[in-house]
């Protein structure tokens, strides 16, 4: 039956290829060679499969499958299955587990806390070694040093720099003062005597007023 089915399949395939390759150049000749190769391959496969089936030996049932020691009876298996659920202990409820955890945690909570190490510095008098007494300064000495530094910084802050006291242009103010002072000093050292009837007025009073006004204007600028 298998050979007949294979022959029918080859014939159907050959007819289909001949119909589709009739319009091709050299199609029939090519199809004949392909058909011959297909027939030979199919015949070889059928022959080899039949030969293998004929020479295949029949293996007897293995002794391992028939050994009763390896395959215990079904009743023993059922007994083991029934006994196994009883051997397994049921899990404890959640309430009992929480109580056990609380009992285990309470001793840890009741333990006394460890003694804290004091971080207070010891004074120089508490040190046992006399050579180390000078290395640790006392608190009073530090306070005195801080107070001395604070008092020295306050006057420095109160004192204004020379640039601020003289104005925005200190050099210009100095130059103007020198020029006006030189102009005022050019006059006679001793003023001429004035008659007693006239009121004695200083000759440099207007120049001094002008100098003061200019200096104030420059300093304000």
UniProtKB/Swiss-Prot annotation:
Residues 125-136 have a biased composition (Low complexity). InterPro entries: IER. The keyword Cytoplasm applies. It is found in: Cytoplasm; Nucleus. Residues 105-155 are annotated as: Disordered. GO terms for cellular component: cytoplasm; nucleoplasm; nucleus. Keywords: Acetylation, Cytoplasm, Nucleus. Pfam families: IER. GO terms for biological process: cell motility; neuron differentiation; positive regulation of transcription by RNA polymerase II; response to fibroblast growth factor. Its main location: cytoplasm. Induction: By growth factors and cycloheximide. It comes from the Eukaryota. The modification N-acetylmethionine is found at residue 1. Belongs to the IER family. DNA-binding protein that seems to act as a transcription factor. Involved in the regulation of neuronal differentiation, acts upon JNK-signaling pathway activation and plays a role in neurite outgrowth in hippocampal cells. May mediate with FIBP FGF-signaling in the establishment of laterality in the embryo. Promotes cell motility, seems to stimulate tumor metastasis. This is Immediate early response gene 2 protein. The lineage of its organism: Eukaryota, Metazoa, Chordata, Craniata, Vertebrata.
């Amino acid at each position: 039956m298998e050979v007949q089915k294979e022959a029918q399949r080859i014939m159907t395939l050959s007819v289909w290829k001949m119909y589709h390759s009739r319009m091709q150049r050299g199609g029939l000749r090519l199809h004949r060679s392909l058909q011959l190769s297909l027939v030979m391959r199919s015949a070889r496969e059928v022959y080899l499969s039949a030969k293998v089936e004929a020479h295949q030996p029949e293996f007897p049932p293995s002794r391992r499958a028939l050994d009763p020691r390896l395959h215990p009876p079904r009743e023993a298996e059922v007994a083991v299955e029934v006994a196994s659920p009883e051997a397994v202990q049921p899990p404890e409820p959640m309430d009992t587990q929480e109580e056990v955890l609380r009992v285990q945690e309470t001793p840890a909570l009741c333990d006394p806390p460890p003694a804290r190490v004091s971080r207070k510095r010891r004074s120089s008098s508490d040190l046992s070694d006399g050579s180390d007494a000078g290395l640790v300064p006392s608190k009073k000495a530090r306070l005195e040093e801080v107070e001395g530094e604070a008092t020295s910084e306050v006057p420095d802050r109160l004192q204004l720099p020379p640039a601020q006291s003289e104005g925005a242009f200190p050099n210009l103010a100095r130059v103007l003062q020198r020029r006006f002072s030189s102009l005022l000093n050019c006059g006679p050292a001793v003023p001429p005597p004035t008659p007693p009837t006239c009121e004695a007025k200083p000759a440099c009073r207007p120049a001094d007023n002008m100098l003061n006004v200019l200096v104030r204007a420059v300093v304000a600028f």
